């Protein structure tokens, strides 16, 4: 399926050693969806052109392979409230000020605007963790086929982002989703069960999961 029939990205296999595939262009919702459907994602700093990446290797998390440590097991027993798609703009704004990627603010105002539009279109989703009325953790990403493309997480109390990821994995497993794309390998995510695969394997898995219809709309849990 072509999400943006007016634009085609280069073959991901032609990216450089760091995974950089293309530079420039306008960050529109349709173009972002087209990128994800080809195993590509935007990542750039404010004031710079849009950079499009398809790294090799890739990091993914199979929903039923999430690892729960002893400390996290204790945290999961706390009376958090878990919600989906009730505070997308707050989650992405928190993520923008609590960046996971080398402590740099990479979630630009342009990205916030585009991903908010994708949320309104039913493609971008947020998972929220509440301690009473306070939003203490969460994550957001894109859903296509039976895959969830994680973008960023945040927490204001210890392990709240891990609670959000565990919450995401539970929901993805119940919906028979195939994998969560974690993009770049990190020791933190690997300690939670994420694994490294080749770009070739990732692209194959991606094409298989895109055979399923997109689960669009405002998500909810019963």
From Swiss-Prot:
It is found in: Cytoplasm. One of its GO terms (molecular function) is leucyl-tRNA--protein transferase activity. GO terms for biological process: protein catabolic process. GO terms for cellular component: cytoplasm. It comes from the Bacteria. It catalyses: N-terminal L-lysyl-[protein] + L-leucyl-tRNA(Leu) = N-terminal L-leucyl-L-lysyl-[protein] + tRNA(Leu) + H(+); N-terminal L-arginyl-[protein] + L-leucyl-tRNA(Leu) = N-terminal L-leucyl-L-arginyl-[protein] + tRNA(Leu) + H(+); L-phenylalanyl-tRNA(Phe) + an N-terminal L-alpha-aminoacyl-[protein] = an N-terminal L-phenylalanyl-L-alpha-aminoacyl-[protein] + tRNA(Phe). Its EC number is 2.3.2.6. HAMAP family: Leu_Phe_trans. PANTHER family: LEUCYL/PHENYLALANYL-TRNA--PROTEIN TRANSFERASE, LEUCYL_PHENYLALANYL-TRNA--PROTEIN TRANSFERASE. Functions in the N-end rule pathway of protein degradation where it conjugates Leu, Phe and, less efficiently, Met from aminoacyl-tRNAs to the N-termini of proteins containing an N-terminal arginine or lysine. Belongs to the L/F-transferase family. This is Leucyl/phenylalanyl-tRNA--protein transferase.
């Amino acid at each position: 399926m072509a999400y943006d029939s007016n634009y085609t990205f280069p073959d991901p296999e032609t990216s450089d050693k760091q995974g950089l595939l293309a530079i420039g262009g306008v960050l529109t919702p349709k173009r972002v969806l087209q990128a994800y459907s080809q195993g590509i994602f935007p990542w750039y700093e404010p004031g710079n052109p849009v950079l499009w990446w398809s790294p090799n290797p890739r990091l993914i998390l199979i929903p039923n392979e999430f690892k729960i440590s002893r400390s996290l097991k204790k945290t999961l027993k706390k009376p958090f409230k878990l919600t989906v798609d009730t505070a997308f703009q707050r989650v992405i704004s928190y993520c923008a000020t609590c960046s996971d990627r080398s402590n740099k603010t990479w979630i630009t105002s342009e990205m916030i605007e585009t991903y908010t539009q994708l949320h309104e279109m039913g493609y971008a989703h947020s998972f929220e963790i509440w301690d009473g009325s306070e939003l203490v953790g969460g994550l957001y990403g894109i859903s296509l086929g039976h895959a969830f493309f994680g973008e960023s997480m945040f927490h204001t109390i210890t392990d709240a982002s891990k609670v959000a990821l565990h919450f995401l994995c539970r929901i993805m497993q119940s919906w028979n989703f195939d994998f969560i794309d974690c993009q770049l390998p990190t020791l933190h995510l690997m300690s939670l069960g994420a694994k490294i695969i080749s770009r070739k394997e990732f692209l194959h898995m991606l094409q298989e999961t895109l055979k399923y219809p997109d689960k669009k709309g405002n998500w909810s849990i019963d």
